[in-house]
UniProtKB/Swiss-Prot annotation:
This is Shikimate dehydrogenase (NADP(+)). It comes from the Bacteria. Pathway: Metabolic intermediate biosynthesis; chorismate biosynthesis; chorismate from D-erythrose 4-phosphate and phosphoenolpyruvate: step 4/7. GO terms for biological process: amino acid biosynthetic process; aromatic amino acid family biosynthetic process; chorismate biosynthetic process; shikimate metabolic process. HAMAP family: Shikimate_DH_AroE. NADP(+) binds at residues 127-131, 151-156, 219, 242. Its EC number is 1.1.1.25. Involved in the biosynthesis of the chorismate, which leads to the biosynthesis of aromatic amino acids. Catalyzes the reversible NADPH linked reduction of 3-dehydroshikimate (DHSA) to yield shikimate (SA). Keywords: Amino-acid biosynthesis, Aromatic amino acid biosynthesis, NADP, Oxidoreductase. GO terms for cellular component: cytosol. Homodimer. Belongs to the shikimate dehydrogenase family. GO terms for molecular function: NADP binding; shikimate 3-dehydrogenase (NADP+) activity.
Length: 277
């Protein structure tokens, strides 16, 4: 019997997840299908109960449901609970179990381009929203000890740091102070929507004085190279856009559902082609 998987969100027509997962199923000769479900906020509970009743094997959760979905699940993974958001649900033994693969997916993506363990790195996070929170907690979870957070509103950065129970040395900074201190970091991670199409001329931080070998990663993938990445490249930095995070979080969800590890490079090249790269 064909296994059913999917993604719920609103809007959902733009999602690249069905193409990525269905190609992986086909490549691994698995009898499964991944479908995009448009689910409005007011019917989220009914939709989740319906998916469970249909016997869906697992599904992803995207905007605007990542927080609200938690009220309708049977169990929530401790890391997802700490992050306060779920983007992957596994249907196992009659229970819907929520996980967050956004942060862990990002960490795996970052590890793929780092020559040294992340635990030894001093990291600067730009932004203190939902994506930053997932990445901060996931970096802390793998043992990173130095993570500073820069945000337009410094109090929001302080709140994010205070919410983490792991032993992490963190300082909340203004974006202005972070700009001056950028040369102190091994890795800079841009987690805001600043620089996303169509406002491509914007950047949260002017890159001007990086240390040699700095990694600059941006979770945005439209455009492929944001202003901050272009500036970082000119400074000789190793750069990474948001495609890697998208692919790695999806691959981790796929692994959780099926027990099979998909071909990451195949997934990545497919997504790049679909985005017109």
């Amino acid at each position: 019997m064909k296994q059913l998987y999917g993604v719920i969100g609103n809007p959902i027509g733009h999602s690249l997840s069905p193409v990525m997962h269905n190609d992986a199923f086909e490549h691994l000769n698995m009898d499964a299908h991944y479908h995009a479900f448009l689910v409005k906020e007011e019917v989220l509970g009914e939709a989740v109960r319906g998916l469970k009743a249909l016997g869906i094997s697992g599904f992803n959760v995207t905007t605007p449901h990542k927080v609200a979905i938690m009220d309708y699940l049977d169990e929530i993974d401790p890391l997802a609970k700490q992050i306060g958001a779920v983007n992957t649900v596994v249907h196992k033994d009659g229970k819907l179990i929520g996980y967050n693969t956004d942060g862990i997916g990002f960490v795996r993506a970052l590890q793929s381009i780092s020559n040294e363990p992340l635990q030894e790195k001093r990291i600067l996070l730009l932004g203190a929203g939902g994506a930053s929170r997932a990445i901060y907690f996931s970096l802390a979870d793998v043992g990173v000890k130095e993570i500073d957070v820069a945000n337009r509103t410094v109090d929001k950065a302080k709140e994010l740091i205070a919410a983490c129970t792991a032993t992490v040395h963190s300082v909340a900074l203004s974006l202005e102070k972070a700009t001056k201190e950028q040369g102190n970091y091994d890795i800079i991670i841009q987690t805001t929507t600043i620089g996303m199409h169509p406002r491509v001329e914007h950047t949260p931080l002017q890159i001007s004085s990086l240390k040699k070998g700095t990694i600059v990663s941006d979770i945005i993938y439209n455009p492929f190279e944001t202003k901050i990445l272009c500036e970082a490249k000119e400074q000789g930095a190793i750069i990474q856009n948001g495609i890697d995070m998208f692919v790695y979080q999806g691959a981790l969800a796929f692994e959780m559902w099926t027990g099979c590890v998909p071909n990451i490079e195949r997934m990545k090249q497919l997504v790049i082609r679909k985005l017109g790269g």
